[in-house]
Amino acid sequence: FIPFARLDDIMVSYAAPGGNVGPHYDSYDVFLLQGSGSRKWQVSGSHSLDLIPNQELRILKSFVPEGQCEVTAGDILYLPPNFSHYGVALEPCFTYSIGFIAPIFDHVKSEFLHYLDAEFELPGIFQDPTRKATDQPGLIPDDLLQAVTEQVSRIKWTKNNILKFTGEFLTQSAANYQSLPPNILSKKKFLSQLSSTSYQIESTVKFLYREQFGFIGGNAFKIPTSSQSIFRQFANTRLIHGHAIQPDSFLAETIFEWLSQGYVRSIKT
């Protein structure tokens, strides 16, 4: 029921009695699903920005709880962005932390400008062969400013540019992402096994779609009209059975490529 575009990661942690990482906060929405065992949580909507240095998490130097609860298997605790929390295991337990993407718009701006840099070219260089001597050498010349204005004004983007950028941005692999080893398989063998194999999107890979585009691994591709329905089904379920795939289809060709890139895994059925 949650859009994959919003899901960041799921982390599983084990703690012995008394185990904890210290009071900290995250800059995005988090659901904490309690697995086996139990844990005591203290939470606060306000916190000091004074952090313990050189820590992977934002560990607070001081923490004053505003509420607390004890959770057991199956309980879920929701934490809004920047809500500090401190969990201590009451017995051996597993906790599943489900994090959500919350793009920082200034970062989006920077990434979009990089995208535009790759998408657009402004050929040529400024020339002024008829330049005359000036008695104001510190002044930016009118023709130079006008030339830059005209060239920069040529950079325009469309709805499709924004859509493609958004899909590529949301499906980029995390810095610590480790892909599956490439599945080295000949095309002939792949096709011979197609009907008896299922294909699943690898757990750390995002596969999204919108309109005629698909997005995976930070790349956009256009989906033929005849293949859009089955691609959307694959993206929504993240699993497809080979008997539903035509051997000569765009989807079969795409899955063959994704196997070699570690985006999907094959499952014998």
Language-model-derived ranges and their functions:
Residues 1-75, 83-125, 130:
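Active-site region of the double-stranded beta-helix
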Residues 78-80, 267:
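Residue-level recognition of conserved beta-strand edge/terminus positions
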Residues 113-174:
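Long, charge-rich alpha-helical interaction segments
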Residues 155-234, 256, 267-269:
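Acidic, low-complexity/disordered tracts enriched in E/D and polar residues
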